[in-house]
Regions:
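Alpha-helical repeat scaffolds
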Residues: 37-42, 68-79, 97-108, 124-136, ...
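Sec-dependent signal peptide recognition
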Residues: 2-8
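TPR alpha-solenoid repeat register
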Residues: 54, 84, 111, 141, ...
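N-terminal leader/linker segments that initiate helical-solenoid repeat arrays
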Residues: 9-69, 73, 83
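Register position in tetratricopeptide repeats
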Residues: 30-31, 64-65, 94, 121, ...
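Flexible helix-coil transition and linker loops at the boundaries of alpha-helical arrays
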Residues: 195-201
Length: 240
């Protein structure tokens, strides 16, 4: 086994000194595939232990997974990296220290995004939306805009921003549901659940929205069928 590992490391060294791992990890992260992105980045660190792009990505991945301590360990390894203040702000967001994020006064595209996220968590939705508009539409910004329009009671305005990653499709289904477009919501949610693991919180979120879409369309049989599936993965009052 050790020989196989050594060969894999040697091939990685020959392949690209970590840079290719960073690019692959970044692509997986952009697609929302956090586990695959993490595994790829960790292999990249074996090849190039101080690769800053890999370290930055690992901080983001662990924060997205709610693993603040692990993120902090990688953040400490970055030292005085130019992106470190923004990543520290993300750690503050993960810890619920939203006003501290605003107090940092971070500028630029990333700074605007972080301030918008803090404002969202503080319930200052219109201010968050004003900051989020005009940002480059990567996955995180698309999701933020979708959530803001949902929370502001203008769900259909958020639909056009969302892409086709599983998290975005589930949110799009919720927006369509809230906007009364039940057939479209049910179709999207039915499709995306086949792409999700039953252990995923996103799977449960998709099922919960699909139940509402089915019952909203007066599809009692379909609604109870999905409700039964939901009861298998989540404790529901009065069921089981």
């Amino acid at each position: 086994m050790r020989g196989v590992w050594a060969l894999a490391v040697a091939l990685g060294l020959a392949w690209g000194q970590g840079g290719d791992y960073a690019a692959r990890c970044a692509r997986l992260y952009a697609q929302g595939a956090l586990e695959a992105a993490q595994a790829t980045c960790e292999l990249g660190l074996v090849v190039a232990p101080q690769d800053r792009e890999v370290l930055r990505l690992l901080v983001r991945i662990h924060l997205d997974k709610g693993e603040v301590a692990q993120a902090q360990a990688y953040l400490d390894r970055l030292g005085e990296d130019p992106e470190a203040p923004y990543l520290r702000a993300r750690a503050l967001l993960a810890e619920g220290r939203y006003r501290e994020v605003l107090a940092l006064g971070l500028e630029g595209t990333e700074g605007r995004l972080l301030r918008a996220l803090a404002l969202e968590r503080l319930g200052r939705l219109e201010e968050a939306l004003a900051l989020a508009r005009g940002l480059p539409l990567d996955r995180e910004v698309r999701l933020l805009l979708g959530r803001l329009y949902l929370e502001l009671g203008r769900p259909l305005e958020g639909v056009a921003y969302l892409g086709d990653t599983p998290e975005e499709v589930v949110l799009k289904g919720r927006l369509l549901l809230a906007g009364g477009r039940l057939a479209e919501a049910a179709s999207l949610l039915e499709e995306v659940r086949s792409r999700l693991s039953p252990e995923s919180p996103l799977y449960r979120e998709a099922l919960a929205a699909l139940v509402l879409a089915r019952f909203g369309r007066l599809d009692g049989q379909g609604g109870f069928s999905v409700l039964g599936e939901l009861a298998q993965v989540e404790n529901l009052p009065g069921l089981g």
